[in-house]
Amino acid sequence: MKNNHNLIYLQELNINDVNRNYVKWLNDYSVVRFTEQKFYKHTIKSVKKFVIEKKKEKDEFLLGIFLSNKKIHVGNIKLGPINYKHKYAEISYFIGEKKFQNLGLGSLAIKKVCKIAKTQYKLKKLIAGVYEKNIPSKKVLEKNKFILEGFISKKYLFEGRRISELIYGKLF
């Protein structure tokens, strides 16, 4: 897939975006393997509640990743929490729709959220924490000029082993 910004758009999620397919992603271990979502059993009710809670937040923004041509929800990217005093935020993301994984959509979403962070919120830095075994996420961050800044040794219990969290950052 060529690097085309118009392939996707980001839009704040609302409860109408919560459907069986979205909940199915969150309950699919292969999709959420490298996220903390793997520890929860999700339902339409619980996901709608989460979306409502995020919409109330002033420092976190849960955005859906949608295909532009079909308006299909394929994943999420979250900006926040934002630290307005120090002008930085964290990001987290995933492509839930398996047939759209490994096509560069996550990279495009990160590029778009970087632009939002810089222009709309006047942030100076973004941070992303990654399980050390999550090679695709490391690649997508590095493609977007995030730099490995450090790690927290043996932070997570992952598939029976302790692994580290890698901390990536990008300055604007």
Predicted regions and their residues:
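Acyl-donor (CoA/ACP) binding surface of acyl/acetyltransferases
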Residues: 1-13, 17-18, 28, 62, ...
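A short helix-loop-beta-strand connector motif used in the catalytic cores of GNAT acetyltransferases and
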Residues: 52-64
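Conserved catalytic core of Hanks-type protein kinase domains
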Residues: 24-25
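Conserved GNAT-fold acetyl-CoA-binding loop/helix
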Residues: 30-51
